[in-house]
Amino acid sequence: MERVVKLAAKHCPFVSKADPSALRRMAGAGLIRAGARCPVVRHALPVAAATGADVSRGFKSDSKQMAMEPSLDEIHLKAGVVNTGSRTCRHADAVKAAAEAATTTPVTKKHQMPKHYASDLNGVGPATTPRFDYDTFYREELDKKHRDKSYRYFNNINRLAKEYPLAHLADPNTRVEVWCSNDYLNMGGHKKIREAMHQCIETYGGGAGGTRNIAGHNQHAVRLEKSLADLHQKPAALVFGSCYVANDATLSTLGRKLPNCIFLSDEMNHASMINGIRNSRCEKIIFKHNDLVDLEAKLASLPLNRPKIIAFESVYSMSGNVAPISEICDLAKKYGAITFLDEVHAVGMYGPRGAGVAEETPGLLSRVDIITGTLAKSYGCVGGYIAASSTLVDMIRSLAPGFIFTTSLPPHVMVGALTAVEHLKVSNVEREQQRSAVRRVKQSLSEIGIPVLSNDTHIVPAMVGDAHLAKLASDSLLHDHNIYVQSINFPTVSVGTERLRITPTPAHNTEHYVQSLTNAMNDVWSKFNINRIDGWEKRGIDVGRLCKFPVLPFTTTH
């Protein structure tokens, strides 16, 4: 801009009569907008854009934001120049030489626009304003996912309530066996749950009508939260749209409100917990997975009076590992921390009434400060919740945006969830049949060398170790054997530990289904030459050990 001014000063009445300091103050959006209307000067403007000058916000520079004044019209008037509103400035010929000289100014590489900024402005808008190429950016982000084999493909799986574990694909006439659903106990298709939901819809309709604060609070929410509080032996509970939201909203709210709070988080925690801690903007310390020595060392390094939250899970969904809950509670008490326990992959399946792993040790439920769970897995519906003290629950209810500003769950969903929770408080049939199916599948796969990561839970991780191979194995099972098992890749699991995650349900506890899966897995492992048990044992990975679940007789119905 300085070069243009100097070259034009000898000829242009506008430039020669204007105050130099005023021109400098205008060397931004005001002058550029006017120049863009000039058929000569506008050709020099892309050079100014390439130098990175900030002309988009009415400021002189990036480093020192000074409002630009006076306007171009004011300077024209002071210089005695008229007809400034015409599309062609009357002094355009005089400034043409300067403009052409400016267009020849070389642009160094460091000043070139990023590739996501379009260089062809097609004459629309100020010539100095680059356009961000959104679609190119989106494509490049997706290309990264394709290159590292972490791109997610959705399979069209339509589970059939009256034929489970069967489902159909896009064609309703097809049938495939579903072996990876999180409807762990088949409660989503349970006759009692379906009938309760149908009846509720007939009476109350399909939607909630609003947030809990505005028209969305009802007797169904009250009853469900009372039942969940009773399940976990807590004074209160609060229901959310999902357990992802429950974890995120609760952790972020606690972290923002507790003064100088610090989180201690297991390195294998779910993304919802990681995100909640991140959103709290609190300090965090990651401790080694299920490592009590590492956790205690980190706790001991902190002041006793500083608020601390230990966040961990009971059953880790991709490995089946179980946390040492009692010992973590001991450390929390010793070092003045509170515990946040995610029982998402345990509620319904563990404990005498389905309250989770903590319920299996007498007296342990009362020692855990905050328990979170889901209504979308063992209970076969949708939603999440927390259970804790009345004051903590009321604080989250009153302060958590993730609870306050979202529509409540529909009445029929809460009725279905309540029916499932109450049913599993008294029925062990589903739990026993599921455990028998899990034991049979693990034993059958082990006998043919399929490397199942050892654990004593319902999770059956068949290890593959390569993202591309895992996808091929999953596709082959589906298309060649009518068996659906989703491949699990990074970032859900670490690179090199890709797997197929199998989750047997009570409906799989038949000789037909167990043998069908075993034969298909054996064929696929041979087809793609995937490592079996011995290959993983050489890497020091514990695979193939049988779980402790008891075996029941096969069921004879689906």
UniProtKB/Swiss-Prot annotation:
One of its GO terms (biological process) is protoporphyrinogen IX biosynthetic process. Pfam families: Aminotran_1_2 (PF00155). Its EC number is 2.3.1.37. The active site is at residue 377. It catalyses: succinyl-CoA + glycine + H(+) = 5-aminolevulinate + CO2 + CoA. The keyword Flavoprotein does not apply. Its cofactor is pyridoxal 5'-phosphate. The modification N6-(pyridoxal phosphate)lysine is found at residue 377. Disruption phenotype: Lethal, unless exogenous ALA is provided, allowing heme biosynthesis from step 2 to proceed. An additional way to maintain cells alive is to add exogenous hemin (heme chloride), thereby fostering cells to use their heme uptake system. It is found in: Mitochondrion matrix. Keywords: Acyltransferase, Heme biosynthesis, Mitochondrion, Pyridoxal phosphate, Transferase, Transit peptide. Substrate binds at residues 152, 265, 284, 492. InterPro entries: 4pyrrol_synth_NH2levulA_synth (IPR010961), Aminotrans_II_pyridoxalP_BS (IPR001917), Aminotransferase_I/II_large (IPR004839), AON_synthase_class-II (IPR050087), PyrdxlP-dep_Trfase (IPR015424), PyrdxlP-dep_Trfase_major (IPR015421), PyrdxlP-dep_Trfase_small (IPR015422). Catalyzes the synthesis of 5-aminolevulinate (ALA) from succinyl-CoA and glycine, the first and rate-limiting step in heme biosynthesis. This is 5-aminolevulinate synthase, mitochondrial. It comes from Schizosaccharomyces pombe (strain 972 / ATCC 24843) (Fission yeast). The lineage of its organism: Eukaryota, Fungi, Dikarya, Ascomycota, Taphrinomycotina. The gene is hem1.
